[in-house]
Amino acid sequence: MKRLFIDTGAWYAVVDKKDPDHRVAKHFLRNNKIPFLTTNFIFDETITLIRSRLGWRVARDFGERLKQSGFVSIIAVKDEDEERAWEIFLKYRDKDFSYTDCTSFAVMERLKIDMAFSFDSHFQIMKFQVVP
């Protein structure tokens, strides 16, 4: 079964009506029935970004909706994922990957997920299909 990994930039674009990708992101999320997943690291990064740009209340509301929605699984990054993430981080030092990016790649590899909802070109560098 196909599953879709959702990255921070996509979550943020869905929330922020002023984001240039807001309409595309919201439309894509509403019109796809593929199972969605993200990681606890992405959840952390997204909540932190929303709070810093849009405020605590918006971050809280988004977090509560996401946790209670049932349409997305939040996967915990495992120790083995962090080991693989560190390998990726060291190997691709010229690519400007964040450590969180690397944990996402590691989880996607482990779970055999090849598609990401992201506006970050780093996923393409790692040969994942990027949508929308």
Residue map of PLM features:
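Short acidic, glycine/proline-enriched helix-loop-strand junctions
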Residues: L66-K78, Y92-D94, F123-P132
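Short secondary-structure boundary segments
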Residues: N40-F41, D101, D120-S121
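Active-site neighborhoods of divalent-metal-dependent phosphate/nucleic-acid chemistry enzymes
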Residues: S73-M115
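Acidic, PIN/NYN-like endoribonuclease modules and their adjacent C-terminal/linker elements
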Residues: M1, F105, E109-P132
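Alpha-helical structural signal
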Residues: A25, F43, G63, E82, ...
